[in-house]
Amino acid sequence: MSSFRLQSDHMQSDASLMTSVRKATSIDETAPKRKHVRSCIIFTWDHHTARPFWTAIKVQPLLANEVQTFKALITIHRVLQEGHKSALVDSQSEKGWLKTCERQYDGESSPKGYSDLIRDYVDYLLDKLSFHAQHPEFNGTFEYKEYISLRQVDDPNEGYETVYDMMNLQDHIDEFQKQLFSNFKRSNKNECRIAALVPLVQESYGIYRFLTSMLRALYSTVDAPETLEPLKHRYKSQHHRLRQFYADCSNLRYLTSLISVPRLPHDPPDLEGDDNIPDLPKRPASIAPQPTGASTIAPQPTGTSPSPPVEMNFPDTSDITPAYSEPEPIQDFWSDPTLDQQLAAQQAAQQAAQQQAELAAQQAAAQQAQLAAQQAAEMERQRMAAQQHQQALEAIQMAQAEQQRIAQEQLAQQQFQMQTQGQLAELEQQLLATRGQLEQSNVLLNQYDARVRTLENELSQAGVNLQEQIHQNDDLIESLKNQILTWKNKYEALAKLYTQLRQEHLDLLSKYKQIQLKASSAQEAIDKKEKMEREMKNKNLELADMILERDRARHELETMHRSQRDKQESTERELRLLQEKAASLERNKSSEVSNLLSRYNTEVAHLEDALHSKDRELANLGVELKSTENRYRQLLQEKEEELEIQKAAVDESLLQLSKLQLDRNDIDQAMDTQIDELLKSQLEKLDDIVDSVLATGIQRLDTSLYELDSPMHAGNQYATPEFILSTIENASNNATDFSTAFNNYFADGPNADHSEVINGVNLFSTAIYEVANNAKGLSRTTGDDQGSDRFVGLSRDLVNMAKRFLSSLFSVNTRKMDVNVKTDLVIGENIELQRYLQQLTQYSEKFLNKESENTVGLLNAPGENIEELVDNQLAETAQAIQQAILRLQNIAAKPKDDSLSPSELQVHDSLLSASIAITEAIARLIKAATASQAEIVAQGRGSSSRGAFYKKHNRWTEGLISAAKAVARATTTLIETADGVVNGTSSFEHLIVACNGVSAATAQLVAASRVKANFASKVQDHLEDAAKAVTEACKALVRQVESVALKAKEVQHEDFSSLGVHEYRRKEIEQQVQILKLENDLVAARRRLFDMRKTSYHVAEE
């Protein structure tokens, strides 16, 4: 249970880290929030690693946006500076990713001006990592624990090299801060750029303090100070530049609200005149670590669970020398009062002996000076006294050794007693643990019983669902057979009709030849021949129509056969898979349940037998005890023997109990092994399901490729550049969510949620399909063949990249990979896919008109209220619709023109009523679209504001605004055209074109809402119904206009039966010439229309 709890906590912390990284690297051009960066730093201190942080960084779509990339570099810099020391070690292997960020913006000028800053920032971070790799004794803020007390220098060459490397890094900081100041914008906020100055100020000041202390130590140690003159000159230059840098930073109010900017004196500190110069300690590998003073920039953590610093308070300029604390004396752990007294007595005896020796020596010297003659005797006496003194000292030392030995024996005895008590306590803890494990095993057994019952219920439910699906498939197969039979009958009837018409055609040809031979000079024969020719032409036309109808029916029949055959095969395949899965599941579950029940029954039987035997033994013991009590005084010896027998029986029963406990442990181990195998088989089945879902996504992408290359599929003809950009943004978000879901699936292992992966595959493949379909539709309206081929080629490359992405995630390819390798694979493929999407986005932006570019500028402007912009646009559209309705009503209320006939007045009234119906349907459509976008924003914004949601999904907002404007313009054009038709200034063809424009604008608005609509949304269904109503009203108006035009043509129909052969031939040639001219005019008009549409993408609409 503890391992599951730890795994759950680890998953929660990873999810919290992912959220903090995503919020710290948001798309907004603001500084990363302190609490999000602090969460990342605390994570490295809590887990002593930075690998999850780098994984979270690489999962985000940073390379698609320059602001996100720059904010990510700031976050990485803060983690390297204030995070755990393992962050510097783990980041050494991530230099390749940093170089990828640099290459992404190499040689390009970005719209917001971050490309140069990103390249310089990456260069500095790589330089910093190289420095820490060469000098691992430094932390992120350059506070070396062993360099605090600088008194003596062991190796001046090493100190010189360290100072030289740190000065190079200080120069790099100075170059980068100058680049930052030169890129400040006057019109926009510079919070994001100022945030990069915070770690630079902290690191530069830490390096400055260290250089000051190190140079003072070198000057106090080196014999030739002139060798340090280059370093001194460079130090002074850096001092003045650093002072200017801090002065510039003090003028930034936002920066001073975050940190305290240091203040340096005008003149650099004196490096040679300080008497209290600290010494330079030895290397960390050769001395034991000493306690260090507190750092003023980034306090070092203490204890086992350190916490990183939050506020960075810089000291004054006078506090250059770091604090120093002397090492504390080591206390004797085995100190004892009796031993202290003994040692004091020994020291007193030694001092007395020394005093006696000194006194004897003084007396000997005086006697030697006075009595030179007795020198030999005195020397002998002194030798004897020294020998006696030596013997006394040896006796004292022996007594002290004996006392020390006795004290050590007592201490060893005490340690043995304490060890024995510890072993007893440990045995008691093991006994309690064994009891707890027994209770836990009973609870686990109950859980297994409940799980078996749950699996039985699931098995029965799966069987019921399988039977229902089988019945549904049978009904579907039966309906398909009926449809096939119906189409077959239609085909046979058409074949018979075609045979009959062909026979009639042959008969007419034979009659025509006979009449042509007989009627060479008679006018009557000529008339009959012409009549026969006309009849033959009509028959030929009917025959051609029937042939076309036959070919169309044959094609539809083949298509229906093919689709029904594919559906039947897929249904049969799914049915077989379901049957096999159900059978295998039933076999596995039944065998597992039977095995578990048999084991449980056997174990219960063994335990019951043991319990009964123990009860019988206790009953026998009770009887024997009663009998022995009655015969106690008479049979004392027999009682003792019986007690011995009873003791042996109890020992045997205890042995049996221990054996039963061992057997139970073996059973539990076997059950755990079987459960692990069952889980492994279930995981393999789930992997197969994920592979099948990936295969379905690839099949959908293949369909998209076929439709993209097929001339029979025109794509979405109503697609606009704004809508294309919104679908690309949706595809980018779905790709990121899909990558995140798969990384979680790889990282969680058996505890992974497969539903997120399956949902992510479906959403990802659908989004790519929509991008390709809309891209093809937009490419057909550009009028530029080369540009159209380029656009379709980019879409084809995107679909192929998505197929490669899905193909690389099959279990066959990833089964033998490590989790980190799998995660890197998903991240790399996602980055490559985002690059393709970025290319398609850049090419699509070429088709935006000036109005759309102005909309984009308003969306990206920091001071604009996006909520009011969107609401005002929808309100203006609704107001335009209401004005159109009022205008139509005013036109209808005008007095009728007396010069028009009643039929013409009736036609005008019907056209006005149909136009009013269209505008009313459009008004309902606008209301439904307003409700739909309100629902989308309410469910998608979460805790953020509406304006933040619109800015985050700016492409979708552009498409929505553009679609609303298109509806308003199309409605206005329809009203003006209807007024022109009534007044006689416009033709019926103008009205048909206006209706088609309304239908296209309606489809664009519905598609813009459908991109972000929720699944099974009632509001979206209402919007779809309103769009259908508008389309039906437009079709009704078009049919009405066409019927009026057809009646006019019938009135103007000429009679050609009275014309002669020559006149008829001349009329026919003139008509063909007119048709050819009209066709040429039609081609030219279409070319002009293509040019106008192409130009409309670059010129503002009036």
Swiss-Prot record:
Stored SMART domains: ENTH, ILWEQ
Coiled-coil stretches noted in the UniProt entry, renumbered to this chain: 338-661
Any single GO CC term annotated in Swiss-Prot or TrEMBL for this entry: medial cortex
InterPro entries for this protein: ANTH_dom (IPR011417), ENTH (IPR013809), ENTH_VHS (IPR008942), I/LWEQ_dom_sf (IPR035964), ILWEQ_dom (IPR002558), Sla2_fam (IPR030224)
Segments of this protein annotated with the region Disordered: 265-334
Pfam families, A to Z: ANTH, I_LWEQ
Main location: cytoplasm
Function as written in the Swiss-Prot or TrEMBL entry: Required for cellular morphogenesis and polarization of the cortical cytoskeleton. Required for establishment of new polarized growth zones where it acts in actin organization. Involved plasma membrane internalization and is essential for fluid-phase endocytosis.
PANTHER family per record: HUNTINGTIN INTERACTING PROTEIN 1
Family: Belongs to the SLA2 family.
Protein name as catalogued: Endocytosis protein end4
Species of provenance: Schizosaccharomyces pombe (strain 972 / ATCC 24843)
Classification of source organism: Eukaryota, Fungi, Dikarya, Ascomycota, Taphrinomycotina
